[in-house]
Amino acid sequence: MLGFIIIFFAKIVEVSLTTIRIVLITRGEKFYGSIIGFFEVLIWLYIIGTMLVGINEAPLKMITYASGFACGNYIGCILEEKLALGLITINAIVSVKDGYTLAELLRKENVGVTIVNAKGLKEEKKMLILHVKRKRKCELIKLISDSHINAVISLMDTKTIYGGYGIRK
């Protein structure tokens, strides 16, 4: 019974680490991704060694392994959201008047804002471009929403930013 529990929880840890490692590597953090990969493989080797011993007599080990894998994916995604690693670009399209108001509001929160002229269907617009850490995403979207400014907001993952204001790695 203890073997099943170890397989289940070790697989959760291993797959969660895999999720974090992949996110780190795709965001350019090769060093940290490699370190996590080292521990990930150690855990995997332990799990496989534990699992393969007596698998014919205890085929439920496969179900335990698969369950740990599924739970690990779910928990890994939750961890990745909580860690909010990396950067995002937020584009907010607003009226000309609201563009300057919103830019000032964001700058008071120590956010670098670039204002670009844009053309809507019926009128001129302003597009505000913000490059921020993902950890600030919810805070800034709430700030824009709470300002009661009618904005069209889009978010994009950003791999690398050179220069700019207010962003430190």
Tell where the protein language model's regions lie, with residue ranges.
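Membrane-targeting alpha-helical segments
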Residues: M1-E81
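Generic structural signal for short, solvent-exposed loop/turn connectors between secondary structure elements
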Residues: M1-L2, E123-K125, K169
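Arginine residue identity/basic-tract feature
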Residues: R21, R27, R107, R134-R136, ...
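Short amphipathic alpha-helical patches
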Residues: Y32, I36-G49, M62, Y74, ...
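Short glycine- and Lys/Arg-enriched binding-loop motifs that mark or flank ligand-binding interfaces
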Residues: T64, G68, V116, K159
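Canonical alpha-helical transmembrane segment with a positive-inside/aromatic-interface signature
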Residues: C71-K133, E139, D146, A151-V152
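A membrane-cytosol interface segment of integral membrane proteins
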Residues: K137-K169
